[in-house]
């Protein structure tokens, strides 16, 4: 079982991911913009008591703070620096930006194949479910 944070401003996408990943046995928390993600991670406001996820799935384009902004903040924080990030993007051209975000482990283009995403998450989590 892995702890996964899903962040997407499209609530139907976040809900579908939560349902799908929980079905695979993961514990999933959702947030709907970058600022909510920072709160869920215990970064802003600072809260060392918040559990650190094993994986963060972030949409690139979000209001308040985009996915790469969340990645940058995660990488600055010792507690979340090593959390792998899977980026969801509707714009394939955004993939090149991951060079500036060393914690981005993978990109998935929207719309995505749910089965392929589940397999990718399973592989990233070492088969933990």
Task: Put a short name on every predicted segment.
Residues 112-121:
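C-terminal output helix
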């Amino acid at each position: 079982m892995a702890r996964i944070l899903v962040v997407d401003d499209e609530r139907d996408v976040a809900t579908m991911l939560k349902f799908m990943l929980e079905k695979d046995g993961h514990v999933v928390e959702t947030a709907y913009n970058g600022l909510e993600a920072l709160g869920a991670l215990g970064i802003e406001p600072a809260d060392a008591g918040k559990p650190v996820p094993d994986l963060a799935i972030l949409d690139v384009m979000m209001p308040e703070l985009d996915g790469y902004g969340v990645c940058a903040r995660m990488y600055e924080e010792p507690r979340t620096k090593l959390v792998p990030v899977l980026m969801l993007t509707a714009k394939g051209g955004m993939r090149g930006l991951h060079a500036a975000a060393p914690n981005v482990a993978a990109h998935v283009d929207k719309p995505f194949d749910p089965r392929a995403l589940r397999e990718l998450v399973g592989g990233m989590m070492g088969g933990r479910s």
